[in-house]
Amino acid sequence: MLPSLLEVYDEPFADSSALPSLLLSKITKEDVTVALSGDGGDESFLGYNHFDLVKKPNYFLYIPYFVRSIISMLIPKFIFKHRAEKLKRILKIKNDHEFIEGIFTGYNSITLDRSLNWLSNYKNYKHLSRNNYQRTADLNIKLWLENDSNVKVDRASMAFSVEVRSPFLDYRIIEFARTLPISYRYYPGKKKRILRDVLKKYIPEEVFDQPKSGFSVPLGDWIREDLRKEMLEVLSDENLKMVHNLNIPKFKKMLNDHMDGNADYKSYIWRVYVLVKWIKNNNLDEKNYQ
C-alpha cells in the first residue's frame, strides 16, 4: 500500500497510521458509504495518554534548575542507552510551559532541538487557558487534529469514496467541553470521564473499559525486516543528499542503530523515508522544494 499512500496524500505525510486508515476505508466501503468517526473526542475530553504527563512537572520543578542541570550531565549513557537523551531534556525543562511544548516537539528526539520556534505561531492560542490540561488540549486541536488527524482520515476515506462524519468536531460540542471542569473530563485511570458515564447507560462498561490503544502498525519491525531492503535502497547516501539541512551522519547512525536493534527510531526513519520518496516521485531537488 506504500504507492497508494504517496498518491493519496500527495504531500510528505508521515503519520504511519495512514496505512491502516487506508485499509479500514477500503474495507468499510464494502458495506457502507457514510461512517462516523470519533476524531476530536480525545482533544475535548482529554483522552490521550500524554495527558498523564501534564501533572509530572509539578513534582520535579520544585528541584532548582541548576541542580537538575547538574544531574542531567551525570546520567550515564551506557546504562540508559537511547533514553539518556530523553532524561536529560526532561531534567533541563525550565517551567511547565516548556514541558507542554515538549510533549509535541518530542523530548525523546535527538533530531529536534528545543530551540525550534515552530510553536511560536501558536503561543497566543495555547494561552487562552491557564490550566495546563486545557492548554495541552488546545495545542492538540491546533497542531495535531488540524494538521494530522483530520488530514489523515479525510484523504484516506475519500480515496475509497467513504463519507466520514465527525460529530465531536461540531463547534458546539468543543465549546461546551471547554466549559466543563477538568475533573468532569479527566482523572488518572479514567480518561474521557463524562463520555464513559454517558456510554455506560447504553453499553456494559466492561465492553469499553479497555486500555487506550493507538491506531498503530508494527513499523519498527517492518523497517528491520519486511521493509529492510526498501528502506536501505531509498535511504541511500545519494538520496539523503536531496533532503535540505539533514544531518546525514547522525541520521545514518540512527538508521543503523535501529536496524541492529539497539534503539527505536522508527518514527524518525519513517519521516525521512516518506520525504525522500515524495521528493523523488515529484522529481524535485533542493532548489525548488525547500
Task: Give names to the regions the model predicted.
Residues I203-N262:
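PAPS-dependent sulfotransferase catalytic core
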Residues M1-S120, A156-Y202, D260-A263, Y268, ...:
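ATP-dependent adenylate-handling active sites, centered on carboxylate activation for C-N bond formation
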Residues L2-L5, W118-N131, H244-N262:
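Short amphipathic alpha-helical segments and their helix-coil junctions
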Residues A14, H127-N140, L255-V272:
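Structural motif
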Residues L145:
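Phosphate/pyrophosphate-binding loops and the adjoining catalytic core of nucleotide-dependent enzymes
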Residues K123-N124, K152-S157, R172-T179, E206-P211, ...:
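Short acidic (Asp/Glu) and glycine-rich catalytic loops that position anionic groups and cofactors
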Residues Y65, D148, V207:
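Secretory-pathway/luminal and periplasmic proteins that interact with or process carbohydrate-rich
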